[in-house]
Amino acid sequence: LTITSFAEFGLAAPLTAALERAGFHTPTPIQAQAIRPQLEGRDILGLAQTGTGKTAAFGLPILHQILALPGRPAPKTCRALILAPTRELAVQIEDHLRRFAGGARITTALVLGGVSRNAQIRQLSRGVDIVIATPGRLTDLVGDRHLRLDEARWVVLDEADRMLDMGFIREVRKLVGALHPRRQSALFSATMPPEVAGLAESLLSNPVRVEVAPRGETIDRIGQSVELVATAEKRGRLAAILSTPEASRVIVFARTKRGADRVAENLAKDGIVAEAIHGNKAQNARNRALDAFRSGRVRVLVATDIAARGIDVTGISHVINYDLPDEAESYVHRIGRTGRNGAGGQAITLCAPDERQKLRAVEKLTRQRLAPGGDAPRPAQREPAFHAEAGEGAKRGGGPRSNAPGGRRRRARRFAAA
């Protein structure tokens, strides 16, 4: 049967009341498919992109079942463990769980790197219902015996493919091995490379498979375009795009941490206020940058792929790929930052001649050719070369020149965001 209302799940009263207060009535597709089996005790293998409502899909069943338990967790234990690849995503998950709980007697603890261990150790010493953690810091605290996982009956691995990309799979396997053998597990991933499939096989028992966005599927309401520009011309082209009134809230993606800093510095020189966010930034600096972006004090955020996981900001008008990603799947994650909650959005890719192979990988994954964009003149013969197969090649130096002048320039919410 198709689920059309959260009321059909029979969730605990505090959860239902919190959803009603927030105006959340209709589950997203992944919530409609995943919540009921988990309430029945089944494991879940979820294939879904970011922004589809995954947090509620695994969070509501855990909260519902914990509320039915008597007593409190024992010291240095937790009842549920949620692993996330990045600090930003972990913070976002905890925030959503608190909202869903609606003031019910649920305790949570964030276990993250980049901040003091002492406060985390004190909180864990009392015992908590739900630990939301990144693998590195959690491995340290478990190894130092500040937390036992053998009483955790629920475990969630969110964005498992990104954990693989970040080299966390070994730590994740070790942590999973310390969990209670009779546990309920869920694994969510946007893609399913062999290593993640192997992890799912060892973690899950006869799981229900739910799939919302098949691999390579992108959101139709996002306008996607590509501009072939020389590397040296990217700075001017980016400034020109950001000078348009339509570019009201923008995420610019750079491939490396150093590259993100360089882009933000160049934008500042061009009179455009921007903040950079990446893994080398301290947690409080990352939080300040995100707060400034959410509040509108800063309208341009420059990010790396890993740091962008967990950015939960509505109203993104543009995503700009200053650099093409090394992995085509990251393109799908990037552009998914815009076009959320029924709104439209634009995704613009600036492609240098030496990035053509990465562009072809993106087009193969998404099964579509990106439309040529930009208002600069572009010779008609350049387009076939631009999309040519590797053996055909493309003329060196082809592509548009930015017509942006030099000098300084002044440049309805739904539950699916959970």
What are these regions (language model features)?
Residues 1-382:
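Conserved helicase RecA-like core
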Residues 117, 380-418:
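Arginine-glycine-rich low-complexity intrinsically disordered regions
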